[in-house]
């Protein structure tokens, strides 16, 4: 019995017929699959690394992120109050129990880490193999407008990615310039995300946000959405 693979093993003595070791005797194990198991594990690890790298490459290519957020992680988020520490724990629970359907709305004053925690969630979920995307809504709408001059193909590609990812973060919603076109485009995005996990961040209150994005979009946003309030000191200026 092989201790490595728990398979019945038969040992046979063979004589090397040719080469510099001709005539030497060797003992071989028949039935041992340790090398097969090792190869399978190495292949599995290589495929996982390839998939994870591809997810990260796509995330970096399609996401619209401020440079200040690129190094953000759940580990380097330092809450400035007991309440914000509770929010950090809630985020960890969300990551550990991610079901692909539950939405979050981070709301509160500037500088409490809404965007920091949101992008941290995407990084942790990508480690688990989920497809994620982080988009600043004002930047997204600006980019889509520019795409009109280059033909609809590029816009369609981006909207397809938005539709397909397991988690979409829409950052800074409500701060975009409000026009009939932007309101319609936001509804299109929200409609495409129906039934899929989306995280929203905003500095606005619920009444202010409803007024900014209109009642129809606000109602669609709030479907299966947990509101997470993040008020406190601006952690980016804690040393100022």
Regions found by a protein language model. Name each.
Residues 78, 107-108, 143-144:
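Surface-exposed cleft-lining segments at the edges of enzyme active sites
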Residues 100-118:
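Walker A/P-loop nucleotide-binding motif
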Residues 66-71, 87-103:
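A short mid-domain helix/strand-loop element embedded in enzyme catalytic domains
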Residues 102, 130-131, 164-168, 194-200:
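Loop/turn-to-beta-strand initiation segments
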Residues 1-80, 84, 227-228, 232, ...:
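A short, basic N-terminal segment
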Residues 82-91, 101, 122, 126-164, ...:
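Short glycine-rich substrate-engagement loop in P-loop NTPases that contacts/grips substrate
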């Amino acid at each position: 019995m092989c201790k490595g693979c728990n398979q019945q093993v038969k040992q046979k003595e063979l004589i090397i017929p040719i080469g510099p070791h001709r005539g030497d005797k060797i003992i071989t194990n028949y039935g041992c699959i340790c090398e097969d198991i090792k190869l399978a594990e190495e292949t599995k690890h290589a495929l996982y690394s390839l998939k994870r790298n591809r997810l990260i490459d796509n995330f970096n290519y399609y996401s619209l992120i401020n440079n200040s957020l690129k190094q953000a992680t759940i580990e380097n988020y330092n809450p400035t109050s007991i309440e914000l520490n509770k929010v950090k724990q809630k985020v960890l629970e969300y990551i550990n129990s991610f079901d692909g359907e539950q939405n979050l709305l981070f709301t509160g004053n500037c500088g409490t880490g809404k965007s920091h925690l949101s992008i941290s969630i995407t990084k942790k979920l990508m480690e688990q193999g989920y497809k994620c995307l982080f988009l600043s809504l004002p930047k997204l709408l600006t980019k889509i407008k520019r795409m009109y001059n280059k033909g609809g193909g590029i816009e369609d590609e981006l909207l397809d990615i938005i539709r397909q990812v397991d988690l979409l973060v829409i950052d800074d919603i409500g701060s975009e310039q409000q026009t009939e076109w932007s309101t319609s485009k936001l509804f299109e995005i929200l409609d495409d995300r129906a039934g899929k996990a989306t995280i929203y961040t905003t500095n606005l209150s619920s009444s202010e946000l409803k007024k900014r994005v209109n009642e129809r979009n606000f109602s669609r946003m709030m479907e299966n959405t947990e509101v997470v309030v993040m008020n406190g000191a601006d952690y980016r200026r804690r040393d100022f």
